[in-house]
Amino acid sequence: DGNKGILLYRGYPIEQLAEKGDFLESCYLLLYGELPTQQEKSDFDRCIMQHTMVHEQFARFFHGFRRDSHPMAVMVACLGAMSAFYHDSIDITDPQQRMIASVRLISKVPTLAAMAYKYSIGQAFVYPRNDLSYAANFLRMCFSVPCEEYKTNPVLTRAMDRIFILHADHEQNASTSTVRLAGSSGANPFACIAAGVACLWGPAHGGANEACLKMLQEIGSVKRIPEFIARAKDKNDPFRLMGFGHRVYKNYDPRAKIMQKTCHEVLKELNIQDDPLLDIAIELEKIALNDEYFVEKKLYPNVDFYSGITLKALGFPTE
């Protein structure tokens, strides 16, 4: 309910799922329509974590890309390629194959995303570890190096987990519509998800958090904020404040409240207080929540505003 600022997954408030559950619990809920029992959760977690490895030929597949390729370009290619590696789960008329494809996508996409990141910075690929949680495993695959032991941080792991939960579902958005449109032609699940990722790439959709960080870099200094606020209010100026307002929510984005709290937890844990981008973001946040123009037009900070800052703090480059 965009007018009331409410988001439910299968009838459960997003606040409840993000605070008390983990991402795989939300996955189970979205797939099966009900929250799992303790045994069902344990079985589902084990099923996902035992399928995190990808075909070894994917390593060679990555070497066909330039190192400076945009990660979304790489992900579109990798997801499409999954249908070439996993022929036994592409028949959409078979419910069992559809579920196998779902499990493979949930389990292997973090591995492929981490490989895309590692390839872009010239580091060795890191194999997944099934004894770690879903989010901890992803962070380890992204940031561990062979020459030293990687230690998981519970605060950062929880932040990553919340980011996954908050982005798991959001009604009939552009990428969901794209996946369903591709699926209506009878295309296999991997091809459909690849199409959805291509749509997600756009700055008006999933690319908004990257665009938000680039905007903060463009502003450059807290002193220049009034200049950019004035430009945002000028109808004749093409400049737009990224990370504010939402097409669905005419009230505060419920995901933004959770992400705001998570963002500050991460920054406190990492003792980040002198980041100029963060200073700009905090000042912009204050203005947006108090300036009559923004309040009247209900241009509150959205989930992309906080997730971009959080991901940057976790160590992910803007691009």
From Swiss-Prot:
Provide a GO biological process annotation. tricarboxylic acid cycle
One MF term from GO for this chain?
A: citrate (Si)-synthase activity
| Single GO cellular component term | cytoplasm
Cited NCBIfam families: cit_synth_I, PRK05614.1
Q: Which family, according to the similarity comment?
A: Belongs to the citrate synthase family.
List the pathway annotation. Answer: Carbohydrate metabolism; tricarboxylic acid cycle; isocitrate from oxaloacetate: step 1/2
Q: Which InterPro entries match?
A: Citrate_synth-like_lrg_a-sub, Citrate_synth-like_sm_a-sub, Citrate_synthase, Citrate_synthase_AS, Citrate_synthase_bac-typ, Citrate_synthase_sf, Citrate_synthase_typ-I
Q: Tell me the enzyme class.
A: transferase
Q: What is its EC number?
A: 2.3.3.16
Record-annotated active site:
H246, D304
Which PROSITE patterns does the record cross-reference, listed alphabetically?
CITRATE_SYNTHASE
Can the keyword Transferase be found in this entry's annotation? Answer: yes
Q: Does the keyword NADP apply?
A: no
**Note from the entry:** Citrate synthase is found in nearly all cells capable of oxidative metabolism.
- Please name the Gene3D superfamilies in this protein's record: Citrate Synthase, domain 1, Cytochrome P450-Terp, domain 2
- Keyword line: Transferase, Tricarboxylic acid cycle
What is the protein's given name?
A: Citrate synthase
Source organism: Bartonella vinsonii
